[in-house]
Amino acid sequence: MPRSLKKGPFIDLHLLKKVETAVEKSDRKPIKTWSRRSMILPNMVGLTIAVHNGRQHVPVHVSEEMVGHKLGEFAATRTYRGHAADKKAKR
């Protein structure tokens, strides 16, 4: 169920402050964050945000299409290694 429109988008205040200072200074260094739950806002477009996936920070370059999505959607937490190979097919 999506968030109510009257509440507005959620973003952690510490991340919002970092984004605003990066936009003011036109700083292109990646912004490190653990806040996967924060929504991507239009003023984040063009920035690189390093989102934590549980093990490391994954750099996410924000584009126009990402606005409205959450940061965690772009940093996968699980690695897919493929299904087990069919042993009969190898023979």
UniProtKB/Swiss-Prot annotation:
PROSITE patterns in the cross-refs: RIBOSOMAL_S19 (PS00323)
GO cellular component terms, A-Z: cytoplasm; small ribosomal subunit
Residue ranges the record marks as coiled coil: none
Classification via InterPro entries: Ribosomal_uS19, Ribosomal_uS19_bac-type, Ribosomal_uS19_CS, Ribosomal_uS19_SF
Gene Ontology process terms (BP): ribosomal small subunit assembly; translation
Gene3D superfamilies hit by this protein: 30s Ribosomal Protein S19, Chain A (3.30.860.10)
GO molecular function list: rRNA binding; structural constituent of ribosome
Family: Belongs to the universal ribosomal protein uS19 family.
Record's protein name: Small ribosomal subunit protein uS19
Protein's organism: Chromohalobacter salexigens (strain ATCC BAA-138 / DSM 3043 / CIP 106854 / NCIMB 13768 / 1H11)
Originating gene: rpsS
